[in-house]
Amino acid sequence: MDRNFLNESNNSTNNRNKYVIYDEEESKPLFYNYDFRKKNKMVMYLFDWMMVVILLIVGGILFLKVTVRGRLFTLDDESISYPKLPELVPMHVLIPVIIALPLAIIIVVSLIVKRDCHDFHHAILGLAQSLALTLLLTGSFKCFIGGLRPNFLEVCDPTPASIAAGNPPVGFSKIYYDRSICSADDSIVNDALSAYPSGHSSITAASFGFLALFIHAKFKIFDNRGHIFLYVIVSGCIIGAGLIGISRVADYRHTFLNVLAGWSIGLIIALSCYRLNYSSLFGRDNHVSIHSHWLTYWNHHDNLNNNNNNIKNNFDLEKNCNQSPNNIALDELNK
């Protein structure tokens, strides 16, 4: 049998497996409409960005405005009696880094090297979705679970006067106090009560984790080429996120479990958001954006429809455009 025929047969079989076509209306998944998505691409993109803005606003409110759930504490608890040290990586330094660094690399790779605006859009959208979802989830955990920072007592700064003016102690031995005995400002105490999970760790893992997936997909790090510098770039993203998280333990802002929880949240969301915008996480097509995937899908679907129409036309003996031998006029055959 001809080898080319076998290759074409295999390719057609692979295409059928890759692109599942739902011919019957009742067999389609919910909200699965080819024509709507094809005709309303800009509306879908606008909706995605609106969701990002909403998530950022809600997450910011949870972080900055909502009072966290209070925790009871004792005045002789050594685990929350650490000194208040200067932050190794303050938030006003972290935010520009986790935004500017991935943005710069994505611009270079997508716009300068690949010159693909759609790939750039999905990379930026995925990064924004990752940060927005992480901010929302981290803020929710901080508000509804919270936790005492290792330097809580020094930040709280209870004095004899504030202890006397606050709520009386509770518990079996009457040794547990609440935040009412703190003499510091409410905003400072609120931050000291929001140790779980680490916000630095989660948003850094979300940003640098997404960036690591992006670089790995574009350059195919483990593609039997042995380029150590590409491996260093990808692993550097993960190491950077790890070091920023560990810095929060070193300056007594978090315990290691707080940091580990933040890492887990950020990495899981980074993986999810990358897959939302690209064809796979670690497959051979993990560099293909969803836009390119749908273009190929639509073309394949349109070709199938055209082929089906041609087949129907070949059996339609009344159709004038049909050029099958069965419906060509006799006078044309006699020419």
UniProtKB/Swiss-Prot annotation:
Name assigned to this protein: PA-phosphatase related-family protein DDB_G0275547
Any single GO CC term annotated in Swiss-Prot or TrEMBL for this entry: membrane
Family: Belongs to the PA-phosphatase related phosphoesterase family.
Family annotation (InterPro entries): P_Acid_Pase_2/haloperoxi_sf, P_Acid_Pase_2/haloperoxidase, PA_PP_rel
Organism expressing this protein natively: Dictyostelium discoideum (Social amoeba)
Disulfide bonds: none
Keywords annotated in UniProt: Membrane, Transmembrane, Transmembrane helix
GO biological process entries: phospholipid dephosphorylation; phospholipid metabolic process
Residue ranges crossing the lipid bilayer per the database entry: 43-63, 93-113, 124-144, 202-222, 226-246, 254-274
Lineage: Eukaryota, Amoebozoa, Evosea, Eumycetozoa, Dictyostelia
